[in-house]
Amino acid sequence: MEPCEDKCKRGLSLNFFEEDGPSLRLNSDSLDFLARDFKVEGMSQDNFDQKTKLYITEESLQKEVNIFLTKIYIRESEREPPQSHNSVFQLLSKIRNSVPNVSAFRNNLSILSKELSFFSFARHIHNRRLCWAEFIYCIRRGIKAIFKTTVQFLPTRLAKIFEKKASEVLKDNLLQTCNSKREGEVCDVKEPAVASSESSDCFNDMQELNNIVDLRDYSNSRFQQNRLLDRNLKGWIQGESEKALKGRRTTKRNDKENYNYPDFSNDNELLFSLATLIVENNPKKENIIPKYYLRYLQRLSRTEINKEIIEIEKLELEVVQFQMSIANLINTQVEVTNTIEELGLRCRPLPNENE
């Protein structure tokens, strides 16, 4: 049996230094221990699948989510982002087949769909780094939520083993990724990860990785300054805002060379949406946006603001429709004849390889 750590260390790799934007690769093998280390005693694998398998196919689930992501991202992008989100549902498939409990999986899927809706405002933002950082954040939240809810359905002894393994994988494998400012290379973990990984080169970069991923932590001024707005965009916003305070119109693009900002399709749309993203996801709303930024936004015409509100309402409707599609998918395709409690079966972990 191949040790879990040999696969886990290849689980997640991030690179924020590629020319065409950050990349994410999530390998479902990193959680293969879920399907391998637990089994149902007294029942063959075939019967196990027939009796307790959740009939939500990867294809049907991916179809719904791909439609959602297409509406949010791809329709306004010049180039399609890498289809990394497919790996999320390979991951869900592993968890689905390993924990034979209908309620747990239904709850987990609902949680994941809510997490996906968090980055809906990224539709307006053509900053690829920000979009993909939000996407990674949602994946992390979804994985943590899945682990948290499935543990409570396991017997006490198994729950402790499961929780320990999940914690090790999350902390020391999935999140153990280099954010090296020297070359932007992903760490090559040579040995199986352990809880005390201070000696690892990756360990010192984990906090920086968390700052990149956790977009809701706007109280971190260093993150806000260095990650939320890149230097060019921040300089352009400040310059445009100062002009607005002097009574100059801000819709012209005659200062592009001076500020060297990215070529967005609609500057006002970007600014309004970026402000919305910040305000909606930060409890300290009165302190997060500089006064000159707010004054600039106030100078937008009522027509422009109304257009933005309409777009956001359409987007919220798409999120609701997506969540309803997932709910319908669960109701129509989850066919479980009996739960593990009704079958009266006992779970136990597989013996270790050395035993």
Swiss-Prot record:
Highest taxon in the source lineage: Eukaryota
Compartments (UniProt record): Cytoplasm
Location, primary (coarse class): cytoplasm
This protein's record includes keyword Cytoplasm: yes
Keywords, alphabetical: Coiled coil, Cytoplasm, Meiosis
GO BP annotation list: actin cytoskeleton organization; lipid droplet localization to prospore membrane leading edge; meiotic cell cycle
Coiled coil feature spans: 298-338
GO cellular component, one term: prospore membrane
Function: Has a role in meiosis.
Protein name: Meiotic coiled-coil protein 4
Source organism per UniProt: Schizosaccharomyces pombe (strain 972 / ATCC 24843)
GN (gene name): mcp4
